[in-house]
Every structure is written in structure tokens, then in C-alpha cells.
Amino acid sequence: MQTPPGKTLVVGASYVALECAGFLTALGFDTTVMVRSILLRGFDQDMARAIGNYMTTTGTTFIHDATPQRLERQEDGKVLVTYLEAGEEKTCVYDTVLFAIGRYAVTQGLNLANAGVEAESNGKFRVNEQEQTNVPNIYAVGDVLYGRMELTPVAIRAG
């Protein structure tokens, strides 16, 4: 990055989104997190609220029940963000917008159906405790697992 990010909007409420927002705030940048529904989906919500409260006390701003609708680059290079917050249209200008809205499994091109591997509609696989798919000699680990936490340490430990 050749220039500092300045006033930043982080769209998303995953651990990656909050980690990015946290370090940007710690570096002194005005940082806002746009949350569609809840922080840290899939995690303990008491802990998620505690993390959100802590981040608020350290300077991160949160916009809850919000979704971006339109982004427009202004002549000065800043980004005008139009969003809905609790159904009401609002706007704000940011220097940088970071989308951290999740991942999806890109498994369709692997032709695994020919091997008999069954995938969910989102491309992810159900596995047993040993990370075996429905085909005993075919395994899956990491972010392609259906219903599992998408955490790097979990994937590393598995395989």
C-alpha cells in the first residue's frame, strides 16, 4: 500500500473483518465496521458481544443492521458509500472500503461427483471425525468443510 488507508469502512463481521478493523484502529485510523446481523457468526455470542464492546472502547465504530447499497468514487478519490441501516438509507464518505464478507468453496471444477463425493449446494463437504468424505479414501480439510469453523489453526491441525 503506497498511501495510508485513512478513514476506513470494513464491511463484514467475521474474525478476519474484526481483526483488520482492530489493527487499523490500533494504528490510529478512523475505522468503522458495517455489521449486517451479528458479530462473529458461529462463535459464542457472549464472547462476540464482549469483543465488540471492547473494540468500541478502543475506538472502532460499529454500524449494526446495515448493508451497503452503492459505492461511488468521488473526484477526490474518496468513496461515497450509500447503505441501509435498519431500513433507512444513509451515506458516508470513506478513504478506503475493505470487504471481508466471507469465503466460499470453489470446488465445482474438481469433478468430484465422478468419484462419488457428495457436496452440499454451497460446494462444501460433510466429513466424519477423520475428515473423510462420504467416499472413505477421499478426505477434505479447511474451509471446504460443511458446518465447521473456518479457522486456519483448525485446518492446520486437521491436515
Task: Name these PLM-found stretches.
Residues 5-9, 15-88, 149-156:
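Rossmann-like dinucleotide-binding cores of NAD(P)H-dependent redox enzymes
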Residues 11, 18, 41-42, 58, ...:
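Thr-Gly-centered strand-to-loop micro-motif
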Residues 1-5, 91-158:
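FAD-site-proximal beta/loop scaffold in flavoenzymes
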